[in-house]
Amino acid sequence: MAFLKKSLFLVLFLGLVSLSICEEEKREEENEEVQEDDDQSEEKRGFLDVIKHVGKAALGVVTHLINQGEQ
């Protein structure tokens, strides 16, 4: 009977250890996904900033050309 108890405790302990390891790996993967999403968001923001600056510059040039044409 004592042998069965020890075996059962060993199996339960090993099961808990493997479950803990799986949970840790899952958390690490989720953190990596969040970090990748953050990186992609930063790239999008950078791209949108470039587009905004190009648009402002183009608007300035067009405005300047229109003002020259009116004079």
From Swiss-Prot:
Keyword Cytoplasm found: no
Predominant localisation class: secreted
Propeptide: 23-43, 70-71
GO cellular component: extracellular region
Xref: InterPro entries: Frog_antimicrobial_propeptide, FSAP
Modified residues (Glutamine amide): 68
Tissue: Expressed by the skin glands.
Pfam families on file: FSAP_sig_propep
Superkingdom of the organism of origin: Eukaryota
GO biological-process terms attached to the record: defense response to bacterium; defense response to fungus; killing of cells of another organism
Location(s), subcellular: Secreted
Keywords carried by this UniProt record: Amidation, Amphibian defense peptide, Antibiotic, Antimicrobial, Cleavage on pair of basic residues, Fungicide, Hemagglutinin, Secreted, Signal
Residues making up the signal peptide according to the UniProt record: 1-22
Function: Has antimicrobial activity against Gram-negative bacterium E.coli (MIC=26.35 uM), against Gram-positive bacterium S.aureus (MIC=6.59 uM) and against fungus C.albicans (MIC=13.18 uM). At higher concentrations also has a bactericidal and fungicidal effect. Has hemagglutinating activity against horse erythrocytes.
Family statement drawn from the similarity comment of this UniProt entry: Belongs to the frog skin active peptide (FSAP) family. Cruzioseptin subfamily.
Name of the protein this chain belongs to: Cruzioseptin-2
